[in-house]
Amino acid sequence: METPALVATVFVSCLVLSITGYSLYIGFGPPSKELRDPFDEHED
């Protein structure tokens, strides 16, 4: 198997999974309490 291609594939896969996990943590985890909702701020 091509070692550089395998290393690059594993690196990119880990990068994508870590970014996805971090964004889910920010969106739904404890830090989500600090996010503001622009729709709640705009009252008609």
Curated annotation (Swiss-Prot):
Q: Which InterPro entries match?
A: PSII_PsbN
Task: Give the family from UniProt.
Answer: Belongs to the PsbN family.
User: What is the recorded name of this protein?
Assistant: Protein PsbN
User: Could you tell me the keywords of this UniProt record?
Assistant: Chloroplast, Membrane, Plastid, Thylakoid, Transmembrane, Transmembrane helix
**What is the purpose of this protein?**
May play a role in photosystem I and II biogenesis.
**Principal localization?**
plastid
Q: Which residues form the signal peptide?
A: none
Q: Where in the cell is it found?
A: Plastid, Chloroplast thylakoid membrane
A Pfam family found in this protein is PsbN
Native source organism of the sequence: Nephroselmis olivacea (Green alga)
Q: Which residues cross the membrane?
A: 7-29
One Gene Ontology biological process: photosynthesis
Q: Which PANTHER family match?
A: PROTEIN PSBN
The topology of this chain with respect to the membrane is: Single-pass membrane protein
Q: Name one GO cellular component term.
A: chloroplast thylakoid membrane
